[in-house]
Amino acid sequence: VFVNHPERVSFEVATEMVTKVEFSVPGENLDYFLINGPTMKEVLMRYTDITGKPSLPAPWTFGLWLSTSFTTNYDEKTVNSFVDGMFDRKIPLSVFHFDCFWMKDFNWCDFTWDSRVFPDPEGMLKRLKAKGLKICVWINSYVGQESSMFKEGVEGGYFLKRPNGDVWQWDMWQPGLAIVDFTNPAACEWYSKKLEALLDMGVDCFKTDFGERIPTDAVYYDGSDPVKMHNYYTYLYNKVVFNVLKKKKGEKEAVLFARSATAGGQKFPVHWGGD
């Protein structure tokens, strides 16, 4: 069953009755598809006929990815100890991923390496890539008030707004964070250029974190219904990032490492099932 509904959907899976799956939405209309296979492979083929086909990720993406994850205090020496430790143990490594602390804390996101621990990011990336590694860095679509990008975003009108015209902000992840409005073409271009600079530096792909905690009372540049945009936002977010990667790396090399998704999100591979 493909529930083609961008708003909140309630699924009851064998709860009210163990032999049934129920789904419902507020209101009077619901669009859904019953997709026959009969095999699951055929179901997926037909589902992607409706919602879009993913491209085949590059061969290197099928190798082992090593992440700093929630390592909160690390520098190039620490990174090399992780990488060399894998090589010393004869464990092949394809990608090294820098999670959130490649940027200075409380500046997420500003897309700027924390110079306190990474004074020579371009040199570091070259040294890591000389070991045969691809490089991934963590990003999201939130901009904290301490970020150097916050003022740019406010002045350019690149963030979601409140009904009174103020920037929509909250403190859930970073103090006073704002959310990039991907219905605004100028905001998409601004965000894309920040990512292009990282790719020019030697980054190969991005972990597109978050994208699911999107308010339903915000005002969008194009007037979109914020309730319907709650799920669709992540599609636009990952589309923008994937298009940057296609532009700079080519379609056969473009890959991201996405957390949130909605119907059609598979067109921007890949997603992980962790969070």
Residue ranges and their predicted role:
Residues 1-275:
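Catalytic-domain carbohydrate-binding cleft regions of carbohydrate-active enzymes
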